[in-house]
From Swiss-Prot:
Pfam families: SDE2, SDE2_2C, Sde2_N_Ubi_vert. The keyword Transferase does not apply. A motif (PIP-box) lies at residues 39-52. Its main location: nucleus. This is Splicing regulator SDE2.
Length: 451
């Protein structure tokens, strides 16, 4: 007896569900699916078969009365969506902040936690106040405690004791020294005020004769009259305020012999007659500053301080008058002195010449210093050099900075820079006219100040 054909149901997209009879009971799922797809004109590769919701193999034998579903295959994508889901799940699991969540009553956990913390803080408020007050009391107690100083250093006490003793000794010694100095000062002043053993007339005569200056021919007659009465004793050397050593002249019946050493500086010295007994008096240098004689020399000559000051004023006035008169020619008066007067006149004229030479040297030095101290106001009146006579920059460098500066300023060029730069700038314009010189080398004109 032939086997009965199996009857199965096929359900798929587009045609619903329909019954299909297989050729035999041993027919496979692949055979009747292939025949059905050929009838529907669709490719078999686009479907997979399910039976009772489960995938079946196409090699299985069909079951009578079973329902087979044809499920279309979906086009597969790139993938990666699953990895995104896995990463998001990991993040959700790692977070511990649940404050945004709500509890069963619908309140957010953030508000619930805040209320709990506030209640706890209110409970601890009293404890905090008590702790703060305790700290304040402890701080106040530390401030009230007196410092514990301990001065038990024997070395310090010994030093204080020795210092007090030394102080007392020093005060006593200082008082003794001060009293001894006062006594010595009084004695020395009394000695200065004592006059030498001479009559009042001799002192007045000597004071009057000291006013004569040895600068001209004045007073020769008075000197001749008193020279016969002078002795042959050597006079003492008079001290000098300017540090010059002068030898006193030897007074004799034949004439006057003197030697004076003038200083090496530029100071001008005048000679003053100081010996009251002769015209060839002791020579003392008098400077232009007005400081004629030191107090020591006045003490030796027996003069008081008041007399010295008045004589200094008188000598200064007479010096100015006789300085102008000494420049005029003076005729020698006929006298009976002869060779003595001629010799004395020669010595005086020699002294005047030396004084005038020293004065001129001092004036020249002062003018030179004034020119050096005001380099900016100096007038460039030197002759310009011939640049064609120089063949290299090195030769121009031998002129020096100031000479190169003057030459550059005379040409209107920039005068700054080092010695080499100035020499190179001046050598570059050698033999060129002013129109041929590079304009960059000219100095910029001075601009007036803005008001």
């Amino acid at each position: 007896m032939a086997e009965a054909a199996a009857l199965v149901w096929i359900r798929g997209p587009g045609f619903g569900c329909k019954a299909v009879r297989c050729a035999s009971a041993r027919c496979t799922v692949r055979d009747f699916i292939h025949r059905h797809c050929q009838d529907q004109n669709v490719p078999v590769e686009n479907f997979f078969v399910k039976c009772n919701g489960a995938l079946i193999y196409t090699s299985d034998t069909v079951q009578h009365g079973a329902v087979y579903s044809l499920e279309p295959r979906l086009c597969g994508g790139k993938g990666g969506f699953g990895s995104m889901l896995r990463a998001l799940g990991a993040q959700i699991e790692k977070t511990t902040n649940r404050e945004a969540c709500r509890d069963l009553s619908g309140r957010r956990l953030r508000d619930v936690n805040h209320e709990k913390a506030m209640a706890e803080w209110v409970k601890q408020q009293a404890e905090r106040e008590a702790e703060k007050e305790q700290k304040r009391l402890e701080r106040l107690q530390r401030k009230l405690v007196e410092p514990k100083h301990c001065f038990t250093s024997p070395d310090y006490q010994q030093q204080c004791h020795e210092m007090a003793e030394r102080l007392e000794d020093s005060v006593l010694k200082g008082m003794q020294a001060a009293s001894s100095k006062m006594v010595s000062a009084e004695i020395s002043e009394n000695r200065k005020r004592q006059w030498p053993t001479k009559s009042q007339t001799d002192r007045e005569a000597s004071a009057g004769k000291r006013r004569y200056f040895w600068l001209g021919m004045e007073g020769l007659e008075t000197a001749e009259g008193s020279s016969s009465e002078s002795s042959d004793d050597d006079s003492e050397e008079a001290p000098s305020t300017s540090g010059m050593g002068f030898h006193a002249p030897k007074i004799g019946g034949s004439g006057v012999e003197m030697a004076a050493k003038f200083p090496s500086g530029s100071q001008r010295a005048r000679v003053v007659n100081t010996d009251p007994g002769s015209p060839e008096q002791l020579q003392i240098p008098v400077t232009d500053s007005g400081r004629h004689i030191s107090e020591d020399s006045c003490a030796e000559l027996g003069e008081s301080k008041e007399h010295m000051e008045s004589r200094m004023v008188t000598e200064t006035e007479e010096t100015q008058e006789k300085k102008a008169e000494s420049r005029e020619p003076i005729e020698e008066e006929p006298t009976g002195a002869g060779l003595n007067k001629d010799k004395e006149t020669e010595e005086r004229t020699d002294g005047e010449r030396v004084a005038e030479v020293a004065c001129e040297e001092r004036e020249n030095v002062a003018v030179a210093k004034l020119q050096e101290s005001q380099p900016g106001n100096a007038v460039i009146d030197k002759e310009t050099i011939d640049l064609l006579a120089f063949t290299s920059v090195a030769e121009l460098e031998l002129l020096g900075l100031e000479k190169l500066k003057c030459e550059l300023m005379a040409l209107g060029l920039k005068c700054g820079g080092t010695l080499q730069e100035r020499a190179a700038r001046l050598f570059s314009v050698r033999g060129l006219a002013k129109e041929q010189i590079d304009p960059a080398l000219f100095a910029k004109p001075l601009k007036g100040k803005k008001k």
